[in-house]
Amino acid sequence: MWRPSENQVYVPPPAPVSKVITTDAYVKRTNIVYHASSSRLLAVGNPYFAIRPANKTLVPKVSGFQYRVFKVVLPDPNKFALPDTSIYDPTTQRLVWACIGLEVGRGQPLGVGISGHPLLNKLDDVENSASYAASPGQDNRVNVAMDYKQTQLCLVGCAPPLGEHWGKGKPCNNGSVNSGDCPPLELITSVIEDGDMVDTGFGAMNFAELQPNKSDVPLDICTATCKYPDYLQMAADPYGDRLFFYLRKEQMFARHFFNRAGTVGEDIPQDLVFKGATKSTVPNAIYFNTPSGSLVSSETQLFNKPFWLQRAQGHNNGICWGNQLFVTVVDTTRSTNMTICAATTQSPSTTYNSTEYKQYMRHVEEFDLQFMFQLCSITLTAEVMAYLHTMNPGILEQWNFGLSPPPNGTLEDKYRYVQSQAITCQKPPPEKAKQDPYAKLSFWEVDLREKFSSELDQYPLGRKFLLQTGVQARSSVRVGRKRPASAATSSSSKPKRSRKK
């Protein structure tokens, strides 16, 4: 007798109800292009820590190993003074901006910035160790400086970028973590904000939680969280708003090799080593290296050159929803830390005395952002509006559109005398003002609402765009053209001699 299989049958998942489509399917591009640029953007601060006497920031932390996340605010194209008003119908269409090109300008010379810790947890030099050191004492920390991993990054999208790092996780219900045990690790994804530290070569992790001794890494990251861009998560975004495209260059090599002082939490298994007659105790094997980014050169620069967006890697092909754009920049090739000294007396002695001078450290950043934006129109059909509402309801709200709720079949109470004291208060609550969804996040805001110009030939990036597209800029001044001959001159010319047959 035949019997059906008792194995579990797996049914394939159903097809998705709605399919994510590219913006090119419902966005129509026009031939109107604008140039916009920021002013010179400068930042000055201490490269290692912020100066906060009495919980008030006097000097911010500005390091060459921080993310610079620019929130670029664009004007509303539907309220824009357009040269041609016939390009769209305001009753059935809406206008949006599309980013088609940008150039991130960087000032300041190339340089290598160093960091360190005056009390770094470094025990032995395990790279060139001639003999074992004496038994470690209670405090073997030393003063060590190093240069970091070299990173250049430019990431563009219309939503904030995402970063990943390792933090302390929660143990399972059946498990427990005692004092001194290694905590469970958890991969955490969060928004990259302006001022967050990049991966310097010691890993993307929360050092405040996972290294509470504050001595295993340099000063600028020992209580911070180093984040690495979550490229996998942003690439998997169905709508592609967080990542139009990115440029990346990373390099590093291990410069020195040390080990840590402290009690080893996990001993080396006995089957991995043979103990010697004079070495019955296995030495410390908690190794680490100091990173180095090596040479910085102008031949490998990603900045101060234009980049054109023809096709984004996701479904959003450069459309700036919400009239905003996020540009994330990392450039460690200009991380020079300047040392500044100030005399403590009005007339210092002619003989050098180091106590008469105070030493300070500062780091400076210089940026210039230039963009090319193309005007686009969207025809508001029922299908397009439903799709936009599913993708981001805030888009239609910004265009003053709302969806009517379905009819309610329940019986509602309606009082006649609404202001009467005989009934409960019927005054509707005031509507809350729409808040910025990124209000609690820290970004470097760049306002371009009054920086748009259609005179492309008046700006460096605009001229590069005209040269790239082969479009000649119109000019009202004619240069190098000959004046046409007048009628009198042409009539006084000699007639041609006729050929005789």
Swiss-Prot record:
Which of UniProt's keywords are assigned here?
A: Capsid protein, Disulfide bond, Host nucleus, Host-virus interaction, Late protein, T=7 icosahedral capsid protein, Viral attachment to host cell, Viral penetration into host cytoplasm, Virion, Virus endocytosis by host, Virus entry into host cell
What GO annotations for molecular function exist for this entry? structural molecule activity
Location of region: Disordered: 476-501
Pfam families hit by this protein: Late_protein_L1
GO cellular component term of the entry, any = T=7 icosahedral viral capsid
What biological process terms from GO does the record include? endocytosis involved in viral entry into host cell; virion attachment to host cell
Q: How does it assemble?
A: Self-assembles into homopentamers. The capsid has an icosahedral symmetry and consists of 72 capsomers, with each capsomer being a pentamer of L1. Interacts with the minor capsid protein L2; this interaction is necessary for viral genome encapsidation. Interacts with protein E2; this interaction enhances E2-dependent replication and transcription activation.
This molecule's function is given as: Forms an icosahedral capsid with a T=7 symmetry and a 50 nm diameter. The capsid is composed of 72 pentamers linked to each other by disulfide bonds and associated with L2 proteins. Binds to heparan sulfate proteoglycans on cell surface of basal layer keratinocytes to provide initial virion attachment. This binding mediates a conformational change in the virus capsid that facilitates efficient infection. The virion enters the host cell via endocytosis. During virus trafficking, L1 protein dissociates from the viral DNA and the genomic DNA is released to the host nucleus.
Q: Spell out the family assignment given in the record's similarity comment.
A: Belongs to the papillomaviridae L1 protein family.
Protein's UniProt name: Major capsid protein L1
Name the source organism.
Human papillomavirus type 55
Q: What is the lineage of its organism?
A: Viruses, Monodnaviria, Shotokuvirae, Cossaviricota, Papovaviricetes
